[in-house]
Design a protein with these regions (language model features):
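A short beta-loop-alpha structural element at the N-terminal edge
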Residues: 7-21
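Helix-loop element at the rim of GNAT/NAT acetyltransferase active sites that forms part
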Residues: 23-36, 43
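Cytosolic beta-strand hydrophobic patch enriched in CBS
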Residues: 51-56
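Conserved acyl-donor/pantetheine-binding loop and adjacent beta-alpha core of acyl/acetyltransferases
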Residues: 59-100, 106, 156-163
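Conserved acetyl-CoA-binding loop-helix of GNAT-fold acetyltransferases
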Residues: 101, 107-120
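Conserved GNAT acetyl-CoA-binding A-motif
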Residues: 115, 120-135
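C-terminal "cap" of GNAT-fold acetyltransferases
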Residues: 135-136, 154-173
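Conserved acetyl-CoA-binding loop of GNAT-fold acetyltransferases
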Residues: 143-153
Length: 173
């Protein structure tokens, strides 16, 4: 894991990086699932502390990110993806809205490290849990990050069938 820090920097998103985040999101997700620029700009503006970026040290290029909003709800619904007004900075739960890493940078542990950093920060902030939805093919990956599969989600974002997963932050090591 140490070598990941030799190549990459992990940090909070900066103002003006929404366009780059949308380009990454568009490369990683089909059009029916990807976030659009006006909404990404709102996420960057309203919840930057819940937006972790991976950047190449040598080039300064953003290569991936994890973003979320906070709420007092404990289940992810489709409206969280499009309505930033649902973000409650004091919320006890975070809803992970996107985990995206450019394809040429995958399988190095970047998503896991961005998630680890976000979850540790939110645990320290007193939040109870993180919730996400994922396709069946990603369930095992998220289990390795400490998530528990709750079964099929109420979310039908993008017309897909999703698994809802939760990570209880106070149980994290």
């Amino acid at each position: 894991m140490e070598e990941i820090y030799e190549k990459y920097v992990f940090r909070t998103v900066r103002k003006g990086e929404a366009e780059t985040a949308v380009a990454i999101e568009t490369a990683c997700f089909p059009p029916n699932e990807a976030c659009v620029l006006p909404i990404m700009k709102q996420r960057v503006k309203m919840a930057p502390e819940l937006f972790i970026v991976a950047e190449e040290k040598n080039t300064g290029k953003m290569i991936g990110f994890v973003n979320a909003i906070a709420t007092d709800e404990n289940s992810l619904r489709d409206e969280f993806f499009t309505d930033i007004r649902l973000h409650n900075p004091q919320g006890k739960y975070i809803m992970i809205l996107s985990v995206a890493v450019l394809s040429e940078y995958r399988h190095q542990g970047l998503a896991k490290e961005m998630m680890r950093q976000l979850l540790n920060r939110q645990k320290e902030a007193g939040r109870l849990a993180a919730v996400l939805t994922c396709l069946d093919s990603k369930v095992e990956m998220y289990k390795k990050m400490g998530y528990v599969d709750l079964g099929i989600s109420q979310s039908s974002w993008g017309g897909e069938e999703w698994h809802e997963m939760i990570c209880h932050l106070q149980n994290m090591e």
